[in-house]
């Protein structure tokens, strides 16, 4: 494992985590599709979570930009899925690099507030989904380890170093980044 300030790097499959409380963070679109990259893998492994994600996107669309929504995995009590809404659309229609980076920072700042306040829903527009998370959460949010792949660097085509710079600015948050 390589450590850089508040970021640790691990080689391995992020989907094969242990039984520790963890939030698997990924960047996603507001269009309701987990169709590629890590999002596709999440859809395959956690179809109930994808259904909640799709419902949230159907209800709120682009209002989700810059927000973080925590969704239970429904199959692993120790795993929450942290959806960072960083682009309106996915695939080749994704937003610009600068927009994606801006919304990444905003959504991670919101996640920080959620962890600090043990509140799964800072944004009142998403309050109806709050109860779902509360009924499925087994630990205080601050006790969850933050894990992610190299977000934004796949389908969104943002150089990892630019997202990494944002993560470094978000101390005291600590991230574990997985690569294969």
Swiss-Prot record:
InterPro entries: ADP-ribose_metab_enzymes (IPR050892), Macro_dom (IPR002589), Macro_dom-like (IPR043472)
Reaction it catalyzes: ADP-alpha-D-ribose 1''-phosphate + H2O = ADP-D-ribose + phosphate
E.C. number(s) listed in UniProt: 3.1.3.84
Pfam families: Macro
Enzyme class, spelled out: hydrolase
Keywords: Hydrolase, Protein phosphatase
Origin superkingdom: Eukaryota
Coiled-coil portions: none
Residue span(s) of domain Macro: 1-180
GO molecular function, one term: phosphoprotein phosphatase activity
PROSITE patterns reported for this sequence: MACRO
Binding site for substrate: 12-14, 27-29, 34-39, 151-157
GO BP: peptidyl-glutamate ADP-deribosylation
Record keyword Nucleotide-binding present: no
Transmembrane segments: none
Family: Belongs to the POA1 family.
Task of the protein: Highly specific phosphatase involved in the metabolism of ADP-ribose 1''-phosphate (Appr1p) which is produced as a consequence of tRNA splicing.
Name of the protein described by the UniProt record: ADP-ribose 1''-phosphate phosphatase
Species for this entry: Vanderwaltozyma polyspora (strain ATCC 22028 / DSM 70294 / BCRC 21397 / CBS 2163 / NBRC 10782 / NRRL Y-8283 / UCD 57-17)
């Amino acid at each position: 494992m390589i450590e850089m300030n508040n970021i640790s790097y691990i080689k391995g499959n992020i989907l094969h985590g242990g039984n520790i409380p963890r939030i698997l963070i990924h960047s996603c679109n507001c269009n309701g599709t987990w169709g590629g990259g890590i999002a596709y893998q999440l859809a395959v492994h956690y179809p109930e979570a994808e259904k909640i994600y799709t419902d949230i996107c159907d209800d709120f669309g682009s209002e989700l930009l810059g927000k973080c929504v925590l969704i239970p995995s429904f199959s692993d009590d120790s795993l929450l899925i942290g959806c960072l809404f960083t682009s309106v659309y996915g695939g080749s229609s994704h937003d610009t690099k600068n927009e994606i980076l801006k919304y990444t920072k905003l959504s991670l700042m919101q996640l920080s507030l959620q962890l600090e306040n043990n509140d799964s829903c800072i944004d009142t527009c998403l309050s109806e989904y709050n109860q779902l998370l509360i009924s499925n959460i087994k630990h205080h949010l601050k006790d969850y380890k933050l894990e992610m792949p190299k977000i934004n660097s796949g389908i969104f085509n943002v150089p990892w170093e630019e997202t990494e710079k944002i993560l470094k600015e978000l101390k005291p948050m600590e991230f574990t980044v997985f690569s294969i």
